[in-house]
């Protein structure tokens, strides 16, 4: 499940335990919101989704491995904060849509004995002025940069261990940000998103 990671465009890292706690929380919370349990979460009186911290912890381990320990706290700005409620050990998350973020396109897969390397293209958001079509009339999605994702095995599943920029395959001339937040009434996750287990394709 690469989208909850790619959408926040993390800097290179060689061990997820060294990553910023806010990034780990955001990715894990979005993995919950896009995962198969999203329909089971309740809502508070303000229409915010209530996500148990235990589920966030589970998604963090699924995404980033068994050694990840989250520090639970409120993150985000005042209007769209992911509010942590220690009394019920849960997050109150506003139902929001993120726009202006990249989506992943797996360009290459290299399987090894206990690991897997993915060449991941970051496809920037499309606007009316930037739409391109190929000779067959299909929409062309050209990544603006490429990253090497190393996945390692944890039992039968894989988790993300490192992210490295592929400098010689970078595509210049296209920029994107890590997301502009805007409130919507419903969250419609991609049909292709699974349970949150990061499995090798």
Regions found by a protein language model. Name each.
Residues 125-201:
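Low-complexity, intrinsically disordered terminal/linker segments enriched in charged
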Residues 1-97:
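Core segments of small alpha/beta cavity-forming domains
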Residues 39, 80, 89, 120, ...:
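Intrinsically disordered, low-complexity segments enriched in small/polar residues
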């Amino acid at each position: 499940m690469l989208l909850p990671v790619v959408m926040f465009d993390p800097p290179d890292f060689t061990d997820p335990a060294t990553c910023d706690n806010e990034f780990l929380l955001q990715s894990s919370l979005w993995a919950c919101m896009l995962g198969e349990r999203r329909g089971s979460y309740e809502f508070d009186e303000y229409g915010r989704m209530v996500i148990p911290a235990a589920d966030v912890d589970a998604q963090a381990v699924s995404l980033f491995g068994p050694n990840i320990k989250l520090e639970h706290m409120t993150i985000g700005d005042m209007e769209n904060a992911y509010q942590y409620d220690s009394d019920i050990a849960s997050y109150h998350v506003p139902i929001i849509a993120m726009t202006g973020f990249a989506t992943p396109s797996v360009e290459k897969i290299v399987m090894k004995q206990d690991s897997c390397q993915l060449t991941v293209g970051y496809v920037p958001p499309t606007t009316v002025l930037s739409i391109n079509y190929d000779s067959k009339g299909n929409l062309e999605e050209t990544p603006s940069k490429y990253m090497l994702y190393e996945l390692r095995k944890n039992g039968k599943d894989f988790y993300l261990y490192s992210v490295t920029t592929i400098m010689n395959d970078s595509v210049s001339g296209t920029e994107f940000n890590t997301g502009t937040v805007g409130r919507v009434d419903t969250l419609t996750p991609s049909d292709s998103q699974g349970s949150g287990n990061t499995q090798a394709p």
